[in-house]
Amino acid sequence: MAIKIIKDKCKGCSLCVKACPFDALRIENRLAIVDEGKCTNCNACIAKCKFDAIEAAPEAEKVDLSAYKHIWVFAEQRQGKIQNVALELLGEGKKLAKDISDDTQICAVLIGDDIENLAQECFEYGAEKVYLVQDPLLKNYTTDAYTKVLKQLIDEYKPEIVLYGATHIGRDFAPRIAARCNTGLTADCTHLDVKVSKYIEFAKANTTLDTSTLDPNDPSTGIKQTRPAFGGNLMATIICPKTRPQMSTVRPGVMQKQERQAGATGEIINVKPNLTAADIRIDIKDIVKSAKEMVSLTDADIICSGGRGLGDAS
């Protein structure tokens, strides 16, 4: 929510317009108008208003952070094959879980139909628990169905952190979940930390971020999400201190898969989705695969690229 202008008190003096660093205010007919899409509730305008004509946005209802536990990875699968980025995130999530506490678990969320066999692969790449949601309506990805199902899971089990791959599915899916949970989402993260001391070490070695105000002995374990900003010219670290779950997307290939532990086991929680055909607005008639099997660039360790100047294959 944005700030509120009290019309009876506003004089149209434009002091608030000059104070706003986000260009979220303008004057029309001697009245301040708020662009809610730009307002970040920084409240810089409130301090400048001489007529007490601006009210701060009401604070959101406080969330009991202690009720949220464990790290979830959306184990994206397509046509019965888990995407590599999900396995990479299981490895990263396992590291974060150890840094939070000995009791924090790394869990995979598998959504689809007839995919129970994929749980074993999740265990072998680090998952301790798999939430398995199966239904014929979930055979192919649809925004409506997957969003409803994962939101139901989050409401029931309350994870502290949810990680998604920044694929075309993850980028469509994750923002909707975050909006419905009234929480934040950081896209295209390149580094994740929960321990302040580890974050300080990373920031000093790899960025120009100012860490002078941070205490390396701070016991808090909120996730610090680092990602490029302004076209990659700067690195920004984003936190989500007031809401849960904390959510991030990570591009394929950014994190490292842990070494596969053949035969590893864990707990499978079968979840019956509260889903009907009426919940899904998209009707998938057919899925046509490419006639020629292509190699996914997201799975490649090394990519060689060249223009016409190369001349020939040599």
Listing of model-derived features with the role each one plays in the protein:
Residues 1-314:
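N-terminal glycine-rich FAD/FM-binding segment characteristic of electron-transfer flavoproteins
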